[in-house]
């Protein structure tokens, strides 16, 4: 049975469970549940603190897990990223009092507060910057005002909290993060017979990602305009073209990027396409 770690709370939790549900896996109904078995898919879910998931997976206690890329790298364990999942996007950035810093090199000899000391130490070492890292469990933006640090390194989503604390971002992003599926480094599942289950899980999650990014578009077009229409709707490989009762017309079906739906519909209509319909994709295998 495949053993999977899932975030039990925070910004990762709800989105991870929703994605797994879309992929056809049973999920808990009560947030107090710590373990849940899905016998139909021969899989067991363990709901854990997001920060601990990489540790469990890295030690081989659990087969795979969903966590943030930032948390994976900060844990400094033998675990690797299998698949980016497209949600919980954020950046890990430096920030300091407005006007105090403009570039990373100015952090030499300074005190830096962070909740991601492993990730930060690695970044500073790579660049030869000597700074004192002060580890805090949260609310690091208050550390400068309280005299604990000169600047901070933290995960930033909107930046509003930093602005409210009188701070500004400087330097390039330390890391661009999002939710990721992880497994133990070098472990392909052969040791405990879960290789096939992991492959199926990845394929299902990839299907959800594609289904979220694309829609299915159907339309009718005159035969002589098919090539021009196909240039607008090339699909992932090629559009499906089917004959209609009127031999001068054909029906076309193609997957198109969801964010470009209305633009493509307008251009098809201007070209001469009619009966243009769009359908959601709930699941797919590419």
From Swiss-Prot:
Q: Please identify the protein, giving its name as recorded.
A: ATP phosphoribosyltransferase
Q: How is its activity regulated?
A: Feedback inhibited by histidine.
What biological function has been recorded for the protein in this entry? Catalyzes the condensation of ATP and 5-phosphoribose 1-diphosphate to form N'-(5'-phosphoribosyl)-ATP (PR-ATP). Has a crucial role in the pathway because the rate of histidine biosynthesis seems to be controlled primarily by regulation of HisG enzymatic activity.
Q: Which domain of life, per UniProt?
A: Bacteria
In the record, the note on similarity to other proteins reads:
Belongs to the ATP phosphoribosyltransferase family. Long subfamily.
User: What does the entry give for GO biological process?
Assistant: L-histidine biosynthetic process
Where in the cell? Cytoplasm
Q: Which Pfam families match?
A: HisG, HisG_C
Q: Which organism is it from?
A: Arthrobacter sp. (strain FB24)
A molecular function (GO) held by this record is:
ATP binding
Q: Which InterPro entries match?
A: ATP-PRT_HisG_long (IPR020621), ATP_PRibTrfase_cat (IPR013820), ATP_PRibTrfase_CS (IPR018198), ATP_PRibTrfase_HisG (IPR001348), HisG_C (IPR013115), N-reg_PII-like_a/b (IPR011322), N-reg_PII/ATP_PRibTrfase_C (IPR015867)
Kindly state which reaction or reactions the protein catalyses.
Answer: 1-(5-phospho-beta-D-ribosyl)-ATP + diphosphate = 5-phospho-alpha-D-ribose 1-diphosphate + ATP
Gene Ontology CC entries for this record = cytoplasm
Under which EC number(s) is this enzyme classified? 2.4.2.17
Cofactor names from the entry are: Mg(2+)
């Amino acid at each position: 049975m495949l053993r999977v770690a899932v975030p039990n709370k925070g910004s990762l939790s709800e989105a991870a469970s929703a994605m797994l549900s879309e992929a056809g896996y049973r999920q808990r109904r009560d947030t107090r549940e710590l373990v849940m078995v899905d016998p139909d898919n021969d899989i067991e879910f363990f709901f854990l603190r997001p920060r601990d998931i990489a540790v469990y997976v890295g030690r081989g206690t659990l087969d795979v897990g969903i966590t943030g890329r930032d948390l994976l790298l900060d844990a400094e364990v033998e675990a690797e990223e299998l698949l980016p999942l497209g949600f919980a996007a954020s950046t890990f950035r430096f920030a300091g009092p407005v006007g105090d810093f403009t570039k990373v090199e100015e952090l030499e000899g300074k005190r830096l507060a962070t909740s991601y000391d492993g990730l930060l130490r690695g970044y500073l070492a790579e660049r030869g910057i000597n700074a004192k890292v002060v580890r805090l469990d949260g609310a690091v933006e208050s550390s400068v005002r309280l005299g604990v640090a000169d600047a901070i390194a933290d995960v930033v989503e909107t930046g509003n909290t930093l602005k409210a604390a009188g701070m500004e971002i400087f330097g390039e992003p330390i890391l661009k993060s999002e939710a990721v599926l992880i497994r133990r480094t070098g472990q392909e599942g052969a040791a405990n017979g879960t290789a096939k289950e992991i492959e199926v899980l990845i394929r299902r999650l990839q299907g959800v990602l594609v289904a979220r990014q694309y829609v299915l578009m159907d339309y009718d077009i005159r035969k002589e305009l098919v090539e021009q229409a196909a240039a607008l709707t090339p699909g992932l490989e090629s559009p499906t073209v089917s004959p209609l009762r009127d031999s001068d017309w054909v029906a076309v079906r193609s997957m198109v990027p969801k964010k470009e739906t209305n633009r493509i519909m307008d251009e098809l209509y201007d070209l001469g396409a009619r009966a243009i319909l769009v359908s959601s994709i709930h699941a797919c295998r590419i």
